[in-house]
Amino acid sequence: VAAGGLKVRGTDGVRADVTAKVVLDASGQAAMLQNKFKLRLWDPVLNKGAIWSYFVGAYRVTGRDEGATMVIQTPDRKGWFWYIPQHDNTVSVGVVAPFDDLFGGGRKDHEKTFNEAVERTPGVKKRIENATRATGFFVTRDYSYRSKEASGDGWVVIGDAFGFLDPLYSSGVLLALKSGELAADAIVDGLQKGDTSKAQLGAWAPGFNKGIDRMRRLVCEYYGGFSFGRFVKKHPELRGTITDLLIGDLFDDKVDKVWAPLEAMYPPGKQPIPAWFAGTPQDEATEKANELIVPDGHLR
């Protein structure tokens, strides 16, 4: 990235200059600008990883819920499986768990780790016991991250190129589209004013980060064992607000009224979830690579 555009190199090795008033990085988890400028910060609390594959002939419900995604908690309550029916009688099945449980102690046999997790989780085992695995195993480590900056002079990052949150509540598409919407408004406004500064292009980021933090809080509460069922039973007047949060109403301060009564139900000694950057020095947080291992064994 350079002033007024960027330098690119094609698959044929030929380099070229591309002129642009604003460079918008929507490169997904490749996060080209985030990696170039060493902006990535890993979540200090959601230190998780995932292993997944695809199965043909796995159990599928019928009727109106045939394509519904399922979340199945592991018996130790430290992790969960996703179970996502897809086309061609295929189901995506993946386990999300603490990093050390999946990869600690030099564990590199991802198939064995996945199968052990399945054996411990009857709700998953019975659904895939008669299925055929259609692919190898995909692996990603430490996958909750965010960029220190959403913009610079002449550039913006959005979607997974900005950040990724543990997908427990399937917030990824919502957050990607919202960041794109907000960034687009800032870019259009900036171009009209002749202002493509960092401040102008990233004016949307503080409010967006606040919204991510609300969803992150719900995810962390889940992993911490908090019972939203008991909470709603005790505070039926907040049922609608909790529902609003879970379905993505993350960008309105009115939803913050749930946190004080939620914390009042904590057991003695439990503290509120620390802020995103708490406890993770920036030099450590930016050293790790976001590894995605695909079935051929390559890093992507």
Language model features: what each stretch is:
Residues 68-74, 97, 117, 128-132, ...:
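A general structural signal for short secondary-structure boundary/capping elements
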Residues 33-40, 94-102, 170-173, 234-253:
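Short secondary-structure transition/capping segments
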Residues 26, 77, 92, 152, ...:
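Short glycine/serine/threonine-biased micro-segments
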Residues 185-300:
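C-terminal helical "tail/cap" subdomain of flavin- and related membrane-associated enzymes
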Residues 22, 52, 80-82, 137, ...:
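Tryptophan-centered motif/residue detector
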Residues 101-186, 192-203:
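FAD/FMN-dependent oxidoreductases across multiple families
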